[in-house]
């Protein structure tokens, strides 16, 4: 018997696709300039591994169960939001090890915002899915 895939699990499948796509973007000719995706986001093997691991984690969560998908969104959302906040303050985040490898990145607030807003936004949506949207499944 085929088990029903919930909306939460569908969101996890979407996140998996999103992160696989982000990894692929870095390898499309014409989208990177001097190692920066769209001329803004520094792309290196650590970023690729982070996004690939995020995608694989989302695939496993979506495939395994609703309960694990909810856990994924709570944990992932917390980690990504915190990474974005750390990046906003210090210029580099911790998930891709940049703060440890390169230290504090001195930049103006608009640059730091452009670099870290995606993690805060994606993490915030994940937190919403994990803590708010998931309530209808309890």
Stretch-by-stretch model annotation:
Residues 1-138:
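Membrane-interface extramembranous regions
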């Amino acid at each position: 018997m085929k088990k029903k895939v919930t909306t939460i699990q569908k969101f996890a499948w979407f996140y998996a696709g999103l992160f696989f796509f982000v990894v692929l973007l870095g390898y499309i000719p014409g989208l990177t300039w001097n190692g920066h995706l769209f001329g803004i986001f520094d792309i290196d093997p650590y970023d690729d591994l982070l996004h690939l691991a995020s995608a694989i984690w989302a695939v496993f969560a979506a495939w395994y169960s609703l309960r694990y998908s909810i856990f994924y969104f709570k944990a992932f959302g917390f980690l990504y939001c915190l990474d974005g906040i750390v990046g906003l303050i210090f210029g580099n985040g911790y998930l891709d090890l940049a703060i440890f490898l390169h230290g504090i990145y001195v930049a103006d607030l608009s640059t730091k915002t452009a670099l870290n807003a995606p993690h805060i936004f994606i993490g915030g949506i994940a937190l919403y899915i994990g803590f708010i949207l998931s309530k209808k499944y309890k």
